[in-house]
């Protein structure tokens, strides 16, 4: 990622791959006739014609586009590095691997294979959710539509033209933690995309469940739902939402003891 490139890729055939190393966010665009953003941006300056000494930097001319794929060349595969990369496929059957970081993958036309790798990775599609069929397979998922049939693994989110879908629904994953949190403090909010998205974003940023709960209390969300900011009222609300019956005085006091640290 610290290298400097200013080049055009030409290839006569075979199965080819562009791979980026390092942790800087990069763009790999496999579309023929397109630019990728790899390595350090190109920088320019003015120099004295006699001494060649730099007389003025030209940051206004800085260009992140560094690697060009010739318009008749087909590169099949892209592998990202440790940053939050964007990988764009072409009309071939591409293999796109995000690597580390929270990556965004777009296969385009063709039957593509995509692996998000580490991080919170997203596979994007141009059309609406109704245009595709999502199928669970051994070891991953596949999605079929006008673009072809793609298979993917290590992907946490799908983005369509009209909506986003979270796939990381286990209790240890962010979308699962979001549903658990809202199920306790505000079950009705699970049907509100804006609230779900806001809470999910907090978990994606690394917040713990305790952090999210405290923030919900601080901004008044829990108090608004419970009708009170009193710990005992909040504990009773949470118990009712989870168990379905009111908490006894003893149970409510036990829950409060966890909240205030007496029984942490």
Pin down the residues of each PLM region.
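Acidic/polar low-complexity surface segments
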Residues: 1, 27-77
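Discrete beta-strand positions within long extracellular beta-solenoid architectures
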Residues: 8, 17, 27, 74-77, ...
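Extracellular, beta-strand-rich repeat scaffolds characterized by small/acidic residue-biased motifs
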Residues: 13-15, 22-24, 32, 79-84, ...
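Short amphipathic beta-strand/extended segments with alternating polar/hydrophobic composition
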Residues: 26-31, 135, 148-156, 166-170
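Solvent-exposed, low-complexity segments and loops of surface/extracellular structural proteins
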Residues: 83-87, 95, 100-109, 113, ...
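Acidic glycine/aspartate-rich repeat arrays in secreted/surface proteins
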Residues: 120-147, 159, 225-230
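Composition-driven recognition of low-complexity segments enriched
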Residues: 157-264
């Amino acid at each position: 990622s610290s290298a400097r490139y200013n080049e055009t890729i030409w290839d006569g055939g075979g199965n080819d791959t562009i791979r980026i190393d390092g942790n800087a966010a990069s763009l790999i665009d496999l579309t023929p006739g397109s630019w990728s953003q790899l390595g350090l941006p190109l920088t320019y300056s003015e120099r004295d014609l006699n001494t060649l000494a730099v007389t003025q930097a030209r940051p206004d001319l800085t260009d992140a586009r560094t690697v060009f794929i010739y318009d008749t060349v087909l590169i099949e595969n892209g592998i990202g590095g440790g940053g939050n990369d964007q990988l764009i496929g072409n009309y071939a059957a591409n293999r796109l691997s995000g690597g580390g970081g929270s990556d965004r993958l777009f296969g385009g036309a063709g039957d593509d294979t995509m692996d998000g790798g580490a991080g919170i990775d997203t596979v994007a599609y141009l059309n609406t959710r109704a245009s595709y069929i999502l199928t669970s397979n051994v070891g991953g998922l596949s999605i079929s539509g006008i673009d072809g049939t793609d298979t993917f693994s290590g992907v946490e989110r799908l983005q369509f033209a009209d909506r986003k879908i979270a796939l990381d629904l286990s209790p240890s994953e962010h979308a699962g933690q979001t549903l658990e949190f809202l199920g306790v403090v505000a079950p009705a909010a699970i049907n509100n995309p804006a609230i779900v998205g806001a809470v999910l974003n907090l978990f994606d940023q690394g917040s713990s469940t305790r952090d999210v709960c405290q923030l919900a209390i601080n901004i008044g969300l829990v108090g608004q739902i419970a009708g009170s900011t009193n710990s005992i009222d909040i504990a009773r609300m949470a118990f009712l939402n989870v168990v379905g019956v009111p908490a006894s005085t003893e149970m409510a006091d036990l829950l409060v003891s966890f909240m205030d640290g007496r029984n942490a």
